[in-house]
């Protein structure tokens, strides 16, 4: 669809609802005190910034963020970083916490989270409603799926991408389509996904991003709310119940720009979170955070620049192949192939390699850290060794992932918890 005016009309007629209430239990202690969408990513961002930036860059300027699990840091971040939109100009980013609007229950599932906000959506008078997952890192121009939805005459459109069968098993909804991308079958998180017809090692997976005609969405949500056996979930209940009698289409995920590789990461495990951050260190990463054509917006703290001090023979403050964010001080220490978030301090004679270090961490002298995720606010005692011997890491109370990434949190170090 090349008609810019047509696309701009579609985005103006759309209300986006970002589902950001999930914990992300496969991240273990990393989400003990924050929802997965509030988790840090890429040196200065949080995961929620990516779907929000996609909305703004796509021209979708009316957005609701649905929150539930341990949402304080998420709400605070959205208020600080996304509260500048003008309602009188048709722009808004609103926070929609679970508040028992229609029953005594909190949000029971993805469909129920939308159903409990029907009155808020109706007040916006949108022609289309986008329901978006708030816990993935990706770049997507939502104008494309909106145009495809309108052109096909669909009641619902599901954004999808090809995923290896081994990766999809038990993790993603799996779609079957005909030659016109009409959905013929949908199974939520099967243990044995059906392969794509042209590639037996891949399957077509739902991204958890949907476009609905507004009235059609309301009808299906009301019907589902009256079904006592429903799990109140789009993947488990809504989609399987409508594909036979209604027009439900799949939309292949693509980059916002021609001839560029599409980027999407689940970051739902410690290993995938670590790996996705490490990928950013490439000279030409698949996700280019420096691409001004598709900026990622976030809350910007007023912090001084990063500083590297000491140039002695036995201690030299330096960072190589790394992302080092504002407020960091590398004091006579060495950082290699690592992502350091705001206000991290690495003290003399310490070495940090192949690690993701979240904000406000202090690494004291003579520490050696590699292949690790260090959670926010940790103070690593002098002489601590992390990531070199997994048995020793476990004996200290740290968690070691399936692929050998060591997670360290404040609780594991005996420090007060409740940080976010």
UniProtKB/Swiss-Prot annotation:
Pathway: Glycan biosynthesis; glycogen biosynthesis. Its EC number is 2.7.7.27. Alpha-D-glucose 1-phosphate binds at residues 107, 173, 188-189, 206. The keyword ATP-binding applies. Keywords: ATP-binding, Carbohydrate metabolism, Glycogen biosynthesis, Glycogen metabolism, Nucleotide-binding, Nucleotidyltransferase, Transferase. One of its GO terms (biological process) is glycogen biosynthetic process. SUPFAM superfamilies: Nucleotide-diphospho-sugar transferases (SSF53448), Trimeric LpxA-like enzymes (SSF51161). Gene3D superfamilies: Hexapeptide repeat proteins (2.160.10.10), Spore Coat Polysaccharide Biosynthesis Protein SpsA, Chain A (3.90.550.10). One of its GO terms (molecular function) is ATP binding. Pfam families: Hexapep_GlmU, NTP_transferase. InterPro entries: ADP-Glc_PPase, ADP_Glu_pyroP_CS, GlgC_bac, GlmU/GlgC-like_hexapep, NTP_transferase_dom, Nucleotide-diphossugar_trans, Trimer_LpxA-like_sf. It catalyses: alpha-D-glucose 1-phosphate + ATP + H(+) = ADP-alpha-D-glucose + diphosphate. The keyword ATP-binding applies. It comes from the Bacteria. PANTHER family: GLUCOSE-1-PHOSPHATE ADENYLYLTRANSFERASE, GLUCOSE-1-PHOSPHATE ADENYLYLTRANSFERASE-RELATED. Belongs to the bacterial/plant glucose-1-phosphate adenylyltransferase family. Involved in the biosynthesis of ADP-glucose, a building block required for the elongation reactions to produce glycogen. Catalyzes the reaction between ATP and alpha-D-glucose 1-phosphate (G1P) to produce pyrophosphate and ADP-Glc. Homotetramer. This is Glucose-1-phosphate adenylyltransferase. It comes from Shewanella sp. (strain W3-18-1). The lineage of its organism: Bacteria, Pseudomonadati, Pseudomonadota, Gammaproteobacteria, Alteromonadales.
